[in-house]
Amino acid sequence: MSLFNKVLASVGVGAATVDTKLHKSSYTINEMVTGVVEIVGGNTEQQIDAIYLTLYSNFIREIDDKKVNDQAALQSIKINEPFTIQANEKREIPFSMDLPSIVPVTTGHSRVWIHTGLDIKNAIDPSDKDFLDIQPTRLASAVLSAVQNLGFRLRKVDTEQAPSYLRNRTKIVQEFEFQTTNNTYRRYLDELEIVFLEQSERSVEILIQVDRRARGLGGFLSEAFNMDESFIRLTIFENDNIQAKLADAIESKMR
């Protein structure tokens, strides 16, 4: 091929392209994502140094008391050794990637995607972006249903930057915020937030934030200094009476 074609390829004109093809688009947390990365050569041969797949999620973080949208790389893998793609050559490389338990469910404004990038020396690197539909595990779904059966309504779901005490475990957390509809709970609680810390087929570890309703002058002072929030760390197993276990934990913070 001519030098002219190589120069054009270096600035992205007539260069190699990449397209990631997933075997399916919907996945459950802890499932393995599989597919192939298809590379098609351009008008001239090019050296492909590396192909990277990176799992991303959007999230919200606070900067100077303002909420801004950001994105977090949750996992990245390299799927090849260096090779040369010839002009107009088509090559497929299979891959598999485990979904970590911290990946958020794609509900509300939460989005998850795989970014594919080719590392081509002295050239503009082509890339591809594929969105995933992430569903909760069976046990996580059972936990959320049990909370609603206790008398709470799911108000919103946000993916946010992990608080400082959790950042050694994860960059982001997905918060399920519930508002009480039960008269008994309404007397004591403002809201309930649940974060899934670890998930497997047989167990889930959750963090429950209980926001107690202010009662009297002492209660208002507690709210003023953010002392009205209590935390419960709880592991729920598949054979547990989930609703009863959650009720016991929540009610322990109402006494």
Predicted regions and their residues:
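Terminal, compositionally biased non-globular sequences in eukaryotic proteins
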Residues: 1-255
